[in-house]
């Protein structure tokens, strides 16, 4: 009994030392996936038991344990004797600090800012008083997926096979590819719209959906549509994701019917052929009108047909003959006209001179200057009306002597040629 009692007394005396006086709240180990460029808080809140409220100093250390085989520990932040110190990791000195202004107030958490892929490691928090407590956080920093490229391969006609291609040229592996039909007649492929691992809106959680897409064998980003038809029309969205983010691209599938396309092409070609024939016919009519405009009748000097029809003067200067079949009023030899003129105070001779000046023929020129000039005869005319036939032919310009002869030619039936 004496030996047993002594042993029991020894265990009672040593029990406070065997108990942990410093305790850190939370799990002993945490795994985190973080995106490049983000900020994170690595928690390390702790408690001190009454046995540890003595005068012993409080020491806090944060160290980085690399995943190398050596598992080298690098202390990068400390708190000792109410002083904060930075360790031997210069690339972390400007990006890490304690979350609390006084870490001795039961909070040894730190803020790590502007994360880099090289920050992937295991971070360990150690709080020492009379005893020591530790906590580890496994941090994996990844780059978000780059914006992918989407395209199709294959002819989009009814009954053919089409491959939808999707590829992201950036982002940390592993990358998962998920296709979803976002518009059209049906939705055979379910889409998951999410911005981060904490806001994944779907029937499945973010992690479950991520691993399920990997198991579906869509790692290469290809989706095969076999024997496409009108039901496959629509927009297809490719989502590239990893543990820290996602990116999307959209491609359109529009199935065409080969027979319908042939009909449309035939209709277009037929319309063009009809338009060409119509234009050719109009051009032929214009050429015929310009070339045979004189068939409707003879044209005068100014392009007007005298015997019927209007000549096309714009189509060319053609020689023409003018035939006037009209009866001119006769000039009777009675003295009634002379009496009227005497009554009006105009002698016959003066009237003849005034008319001669008014209706004098123009100077001799080309064929286009020929004109018919009515003139009152000074001599006596034969009684009774009689038809007058005048035939004017294009000729070379006459000289002035001929003009004088025409001026002095005797009149017949009251008209001067």
Curated annotation (Swiss-Prot):
Keyword Membrane in record: yes
Residues spanning the signal sequence: 1-21
Organism, as annotated: Mus musculus
The keyword Thylakoid is annotated on this UniProt entry: no
Sorted UniProt keywords: Disulfide bond, Immunoglobulin domain, Membrane, Repeat, Signal, Transmembrane, Transmembrane helix
Membrane topology: Single-pass type I membrane protein
SMART domains according to UniProt: IG (SM00409), IGc2 (SM00408), IGv (SM00406)
Annotated transmembrane regions: 263-283
Extracellular topological segments: 22-262
Topological domain ranges for the Cytoplasmic compartment: 284-417
Localization terms from the record: Membrane
Name by which UniProt lists this protein: V-set and immunoglobulin domain-containing protein 8
Cellular compartments per GO CC: membrane
Chief location: membrane
């Amino acid at each position: 009994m004496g030996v047993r009692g002594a042993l029991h007394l020894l265990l009672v005396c040593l029990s406070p030392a065997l108990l942990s006086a410093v305790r850190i709240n939370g799990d002993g180990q945490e795994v985190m996936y973080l995106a490049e460029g983000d900020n994170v808080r690595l928690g390390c809140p702790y408690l001190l038991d009454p046995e540890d409220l003595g005068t012993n100093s409080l020491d806090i250390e944060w160290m980085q344990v690399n995943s190398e085989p050596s598992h080298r520990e690098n202390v990068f932040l400390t708190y000792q004797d109410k002083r904060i110190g930075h360790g031997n990791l210069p690339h972390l000195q400007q990006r890490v600090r304690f979350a609390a202004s006084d870490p001795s107030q039961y909070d040894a958490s730190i803020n790590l800012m502007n994360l880099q892929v090289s920050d992937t490691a295991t971070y360990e928090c150690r709080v020492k008083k009379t005893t020591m407590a530790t906590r580890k956080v496994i941090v994996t920093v990844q780059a978000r997926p780059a914006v992918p490229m989407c395209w199709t391969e294959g002819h989009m006609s009814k009954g053919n096979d089409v491959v939808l291609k999707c590829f992201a040229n950036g982002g940390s592996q592993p990358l998962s590819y998920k296709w979803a039909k976002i518009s059209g007649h049906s939705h055979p492929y379910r889409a998951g719209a999410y911005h981060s691992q904490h806001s994944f809106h779907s029937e499945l959680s973010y992690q479950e959906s991520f691993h399920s897409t990997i198991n579906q064998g869509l790692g290469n980003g290809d989706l095969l549509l076999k024997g496409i038809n009108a039901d496959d029309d629509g927009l297809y969205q490719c989502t590239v994701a990893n543990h820290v983010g996602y990116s999307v691209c959209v491609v359109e599938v529009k199935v065409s019917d080969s027979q319908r396309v042939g009909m449309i092409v035939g209709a277009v070609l037929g319309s063009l052929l009809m338009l060409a024939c119509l234009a050719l016919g109009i051009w032929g009519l214009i050429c015929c009108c310009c070339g045979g405009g004189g068939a409707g009748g003879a044209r005068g000097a100014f392009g007007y047909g005298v015997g019927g029809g209007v000549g096309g003067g714009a189509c060319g200067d053609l020689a023409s003959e003018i035939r006037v079949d009209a009866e001119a009023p006769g000039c009777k030899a009675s003295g009634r006209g002379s009496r009227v003129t005497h009554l009006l105070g105009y002698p016959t001779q003066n009237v003849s001179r005034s008319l001669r000046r008014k209706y004098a023929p123009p100077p001799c020129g080309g064929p286009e200057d020929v004109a018919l000039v009515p003139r009152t005869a000074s001599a006596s005319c034969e009684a009774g009306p009689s038809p007058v036939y005048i035939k004017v032919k294009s000729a070379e310009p006459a000289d002035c002597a001929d003009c004088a002869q025409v001026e002095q030619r005797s009149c017949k039936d009251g008209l001067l040629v």
